[in-house]
């Protein structure tokens, strides 16, 4: 019996507690938003199959707890990840500053050459912005990775971010040469909606 997919990619979302990791995953996997999710304890995952350049890619997206007390649990899941999304909250400067610590954690625990992507969430809360887009863009370029600002609430750039990472993994894993793969690593596809003010405050 033929498989329902061509490739299986394990993705991992990391970042401080409260940046909206769970909301992003639920938005991507189920196209749903609820700001009453219980903060993740340990590890949970969702699955969605997407079409990338004619290939069916099954994405297994793992949600991790951001609290330091769960760090050992999170670390156990780094090694099998083919792509890691580092998430911060644009209204929380500390969560952005801690991205450097999460980068260090990836270097110490993940497989060499794992694909990474920087993601600034809650861009629907422009009035409360504390982290400027230029700051994150600079950080992403320093590390040679892509950057998106997203809103789990409005769904802005969520699919684009996950699909971009999946394309990069497919290319690296020997997929046929993809279109537009010479574009700079930092991308911002759309302007985020500034009207919505509700947030997903849980991890």
From Swiss-Prot:
Q: Which UniProt keywords apply?
A: Cell junction, Cell membrane, Cell projection, Cytoplasmic vesicle, Endosome, Golgi apparatus, GTP-binding, Hydrolase, Isopeptide bond, Lipoprotein, Magnesium, Membrane, Metal-binding, Methylation, Nucleotide-binding, Prenylation, Protein transport, Tight junction, Transport, Ubl conjugation
InterPro entries according to UniProt:
P-loop_NTPase (IPR027417), Small_GTP-bd (IPR005225), Small_GTPase (IPR001806), Small_GTPase_Rab (IPR050305)
Annotated binding of Mg(2+), by residue: 22, 40, 63
Which compartment or compartments is the protein found in? Answer: Cell membrane; Cytoplasmic vesicle membrane; Cell junction, Tight junction; Golgi apparatus, trans-Golgi network membrane
SUPFAM superfamilies in alphabetical order: P-loop containing nucleoside triphosphate hydrolases
Q: Which family does it belong to?
A: Belongs to the small GTPase superfamily. Rab family.
User: What does the annotation say about its assembly with partners?
Assistant: Interacts (GTP-bound form) with MICALL2; competes with RAB8A and is involved in tight junctions assembly. Interacts (GTP-bound form) with MICALL1. Interacts (GTP-bound form) with MICAL1, MICAL3, MICALCL, EHBP1 and EHBP1L1; ternary complexes of RAB8A, RAB13 and either MICAL1 or EHBP1L1 are possible. Interacts with PRKACA; downstream effector of RAB13 involved in tight junction assembly. Interacts with GRB2; may recruit RAB13 to the leading edge of migrating endothelial cells where it can activate RHOA. Interacts (isoprenylated form) with PDE6D; dissociates RAB13 from membranes.
Instruction: Please state what the protein is called.
Output: Ras-related protein Rab-13
NCBIfam families attached to this UniProt entry = small_GTP
Please give an example of a GO cellular component term from this record. Answer: lamellipodium
| UniProt binding sites for GTP | 17-18, 20-23, 40, 66, 121-122, 124, 152-153
What does the UniProt record say this protein does? The small GTPases Rab are key regulators of intracellular membrane trafficking, from the formation of transport vesicles to their fusion with membranes. Rabs cycle between an inactive GDP-bound form and an active GTP-bound form that is able to recruit to membranes different sets of downstream effectors directly responsible for vesicle formation, movement, tethering and fusion. RAB13 is involved in endocytic recycling and regulates the transport to the plasma membrane of transmembrane proteins like the tight junction protein OCLN/occludin.
Organism classification, top ranks? Eukaryota, Metazoa, Chordata, Craniata, Vertebrata
Q: What is known of its domains?
A: Switch 1, switch 2 and the interswitch regions are characteristic of Rab GTPases and mediate the interactions with Rab downstream effectors. The switch regions undergo conformational changes upon nucleotide binding which drive interaction with specific sets of effector proteins, with most effectors only binding to GTP-bound Rab.
GO biological process: one example: endosomal transport
Q: Where is this motif: Switch 2?
A: 63-80
Q: Does the keyword Transferase apply?
A: no
Q: Which organism is it from?
A: Bos taurus
**Entries under Pfam families matching the protein:** Ras
Please give the superkingdom of this protein's source.
Eukaryota
Documented activity regulation: Regulated by guanine nucleotide exchange factors (GEFs) including DENND1C, which promote the exchange of bound GDP for free GTP. Regulated by GTPase activating proteins (GAPs) which increase the GTP hydrolysis activity. Inhibited by GDP dissociation inhibitors (GDIs). Activated in response to insulin.
> Span of the secretion signal?
none
User: Is Membrane among the key words of this record?
Assistant: yes
Report the EC number(s), separated by commas if there are several.
Answer: 3.6.5.2
The UniProt GO MF terms for this protein read: GTP binding; GTPase activity
Identify the enzyme class.
hydrolase
Catalytic activity, per the record?
A: GTP + H2O = GDP + phosphate + H(+)
């Amino acid at each position: 019996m033929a498989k329902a997919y061509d490739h299986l990619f394990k993705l991992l979302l990391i970042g401080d507690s409260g940046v909206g990791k769970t909301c992003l995953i639920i938005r991507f996997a189920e196209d749903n938003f609820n700001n009453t999710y219980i903060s993740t304890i340990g590890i949970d995952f969702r699955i969605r199959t997407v079409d990338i350049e004619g290939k069916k890619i099954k994405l297994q997206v793992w949600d991790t707890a951001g609290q330091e007390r769960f760090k050992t649990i999170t670390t156990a899941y780094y090694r099998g990840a083919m792509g890691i999304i580092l998430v911060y909250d644009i209204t929380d400067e500390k969560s952005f500053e801690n991205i450097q610590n999460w980068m260090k954690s990836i270097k110490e625990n993940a497989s060499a050459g794992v694909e990474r992507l920087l993601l600034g969430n809650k861009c629907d809360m422009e009035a409360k912005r504390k982290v400027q887009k230029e700051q994150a863009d600079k950080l992403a370029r320093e590390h040679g990775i892509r950057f998106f600002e997203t809103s789990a609430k409005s769904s802005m750039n969520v699919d684009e971010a996950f699909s971009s990472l999946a394309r990069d993994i497919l290319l690296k894993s020997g997929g046929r040469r993809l279109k537009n793969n010479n574009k700079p690593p930092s991308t911002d596809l759309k302007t985020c909606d500034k009207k919505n003010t509700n947030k997903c405050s849980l991890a």
